[in-house]
């Protein structure tokens, strides 16, 4: 009796739905869901199949999909957000001039020979630079694979990275902050920021200025920034004219005061890193005393912005110190808590998004 009533209800409900039963309706939606999941898995698998030296297309902000070569893959965390998950980044070389940059995983896809031929054979209007890039991608150069250090895997570079060499192409050398004989390096393109030494020449580590001199000096605000430390001008400006942009980039000129401020932050970062993160250094009380002075000086610097603390890697060093499991004799100076306080204040009051993407 109960079965008959149940079957009757099912027939009535089926007739209201145009002859489609509930079970049939659910099954009919399954193929689309399966196809969507399959597409997502195929995209993830394609990303995982990318290897060193593969030709790829990269989507950088303000540019079309651009041919490039894959150099390296690594995982990193946001310097300011202590709760963020790991992000997958790729180091790539852009055709035809081989400027390099770090880009996010969702900005990369494989480049096939058929796609190169299709683009070059298309009658659509395209820029001369993009055509040259696709032409150069047909015969990519031989590469020597780069090696990753333990510090990079920990999302902290103890020294500036040394990029690899391309055959028949000259690369810019990058120098370590730990070396005293730093060399002046010519700047790269807007998307090639990986090293302060490449951007601004000799670091403060190679100068003879003392920490007291650096701490006592005040640097007036750069003409490129307003009273809040933000770039002047409203609206998004085109990447084609980096010289006109009110922000720090390798392509925009820096006045002496801004360079001095960058060197000052690099000096503090170098001293803090050497005192607390160097595996061969024995921490003494003088390190705590000096670190306290450095942190106080950093907190007193006006007009800091996201680019200053991330391009100098100061935020990474402070974060690493702040989360040291054990720091003997830190009760008196409370260095770890001071680092956390600085990171918290930056996360609250500085712009959340970097103005240079992919970094």
Curated annotation (Swiss-Prot):
Keyword 4Fe-4S: no
Keyword presence, Repeat: no
List of residues that carry Phosphoserine: 252
Primary localization class, coarse: nucleus
Encoding gene per record: pdp1
Record keywords, A-Z: Chromatin regulator, DNA damage, Nucleus, Phosphoprotein
Subunit structure of this chain's protein: Interacts with set9 and histone H4K20me1. Associates with nucleosomes.
Polar residues biased stretches: 204-224
InterPro entries attached to this UniProt entry: IOC4-like_PWWP (IPR035503), PWWP_dom (IPR000313)
Domain comment as written in the entry: The C-terminal region mediates association with set9, whereas the N-terminal PWWP domain recognizes H4K20me1.
UniProt name for this protein: PWWP domain-containing protein 1
Gene Ontology biological process terms, A to Z: chromatin remodeling; DNA damage response; regulation of transcription by RNA polymerase II
